[in-house]
């Protein structure tokens, strides 16, 4: 009887260890936690009215996403990864990539100073101080970047920083495809 009681915790431990090992193997085999699906892919940007970051009172709505393909970059000064990606966004903007910034759950004065100090890659900088547009977009945190086509439809969501590797491998081909489609 004593041996059976000792055997039960051993079996439970081995089962848990097996589940844990399976999940580790699955993650190491290529499941990328930054590739989060978005229910908004294939849908238009949600309706909103937000102020310009630098010009309080100047309002924008979702119509700013129509006309040409662009990136919507969700960022904040409290986000260390946003700081790491910012220089690369400046480079992309210099190359002609159209980027709109969404300052997410931040302080306006800190965000404005950030852009003054580090450069401003954004055509428009939206201020989402309470995070409502971010919530509507399904943002988990910053940075996140959405590729939006000329019709205002979200085509791709990237979680994490934009850097030369993921730009060249994933984002640039999608952006170039959207540019080609917009010219047709």
From Swiss-Prot:
InterPro entries: Periplasmic_diS_OxRdtase_DsbE, Redoxin, Thioredoxin-like_sf, Thioredoxin_CS, Thioredoxin_domain, Thioredoxin_ResA/DsbE_sf. It holds the Pfam family Redoxin. Residues 1-4 are cytoplasmic. Disulfide bonds join 79-82. GO terms for biological process: cytochrome complex assembly. Residues 26-184 are periplasmic. Keywords: Cell inner membrane, Cell membrane, Cytochrome c-type biogenesis, Disulfide bond, Membrane, Redox-active center, Transmembrane, Transmembrane helix. It comes from the Bacteria. PROSITE patterns: THIOREDOXIN_1, THIOREDOXIN_2. The chain crosses the membrane at residues 5-25. It is a single-pass membrane protein. It is found in: Cell inner membrane. One of its GO terms (molecular function) is disulfide oxidoreductase activity. Residues 39-176 form the Thioredoxin domain. GO terms for cellular component: outer membrane-bounded periplasmic space; plasma membrane. Its main location: membrane. Belongs to the thioredoxin family. DsbE subfamily. Involved in disulfide bond formation. Catalyzes a late, reductive step in the assembly of periplasmic c-type cytochromes, probably the reduction of disulfide bonds of the apocytochrome c to allow covalent linkage with the heme. Possible subunit of a heme lyase. This is Thiol:disulfide interchange protein DsbE. The gene is dsbE.
């Amino acid at each position: 009887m004593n041996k059976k009681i000792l055997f039960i915790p051993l079996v439970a431990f081995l089962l848990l260890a097996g589940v844990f090992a399976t999940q580790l193997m699955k993650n190491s085999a290529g499941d990328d936690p930054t590739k989060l699906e978005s229910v908004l892919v294939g849908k238009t940007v949600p309706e909103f009215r937000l102020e310009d970051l630098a010009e309080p009172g100047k309002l924008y709505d979702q119509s700013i996403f129509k006309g040409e393909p662009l990136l919507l970059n969700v960022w904040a000064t409290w986000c260390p990864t946003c700081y790491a990606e910012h220089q690369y966004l400046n480079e992309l903007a210099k190359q002609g990539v159209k980027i709109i910034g969404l300052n997410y759950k931040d302080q306006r004065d800190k965000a404005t100073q950030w852009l003054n100090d580090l450069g401003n890659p954004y055509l428009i900088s939206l201020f989402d101080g309470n995070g409502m547009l971010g919530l509507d977009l399904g943002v988990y945190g910053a940075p996140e970047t959405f590729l939006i086509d000329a019709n205002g439809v979200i085509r791709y969501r990237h979680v994490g920083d934009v850097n030369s590797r993921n730009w060249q491998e994933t984002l640039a081909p999608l952006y170039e495809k959207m540019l080609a489609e917009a010219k047709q």
